[in-house]
Amino acid sequence: MPGKQRINAEERKQKIIDAAKPLFANYGFNGTSVRDIARAADVSNALLYKHFPSKEAMYEEILNYTDWLYPKILRNMNKLEPSTEILIFIFYAFFRLILFEVPGSGRNQKEHERLLFYSLLENIDYARKSLNKLYVTAEEVVRKSFLAAEKSGDIIKLGIDRRSRFWFIHHLAMGLNLCHISDEPAFDYDTTFENLMEDAVYFAIRGIGLTDKAIEKYYKPEKLKEMMKLLL
């Protein structure tokens, strides 16, 4: 009987990571043991430690989901000319990227979401690093678009800084995602998921201070949906 096919060190390392991701995503950092990962990867504990010195090191490696996604979005964001319309588009993109499947992400996106939520409950490192990458990716074009909206009179002055408004919108999108992360949503909004997202975006951009006139002029969901091709 032929033996198992030999694989090189990089392939073995990737196999371990692929085995670890769904375990961390489904059971959290604390609920997953090195033995669980070794068993799922079909390797011994000793061989696993040859590639990773600790469970924490494997957890850190899994952050590569955002390493794949964010640089691509950043390159395309930097091509956008800051304006009120782009400010609305960026926040629309937040909701669409968080609530709907990112093309080409496959299972990685769902695992990333579960890892993020588990991280908020226990080992905060994954969430902190992931959210920091998001902020670094979007901060410059968001800041310039806020300034453009203020200069155009499209946004009212609020006693809330831009960074907080940025995060408030993101947290609303994350909260909606959390309520729908299982196959059965936690709430029945009595509308389609697409309409729910569009209503949430409207609620969010109104909340950050955009005027009715600016929203009426620039908040065109069908156009914004088409503009998503600019990012992906």
Question: What residues fall within each predicted segment?
Answer:
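Amphipathic alpha-helical segments used for helix-helix packing
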Residues: V102-N132, L178-I181
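C-terminal peripheral helix-coil segments that are non-catalytic and often amphipathic
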Residues: A93-F100, V136-S152, I156, W167-L232
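Amphipathic, non-transmembrane alpha-helical scaffold segments
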Residues: I17, L63, R128-E139, E194-M197
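Helix-turn-helix
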Residues: K15, L23-Y65
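Conserved hydrophobic residue
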Residues: N30, V43, D125, I155-I156
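Short Lys/Arg-rich basic patches
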Residues: Q5-R6
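Hydrophobic alpha-helical connector segments
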Residues: E61, L74-E111, G159-R162, F166, ...
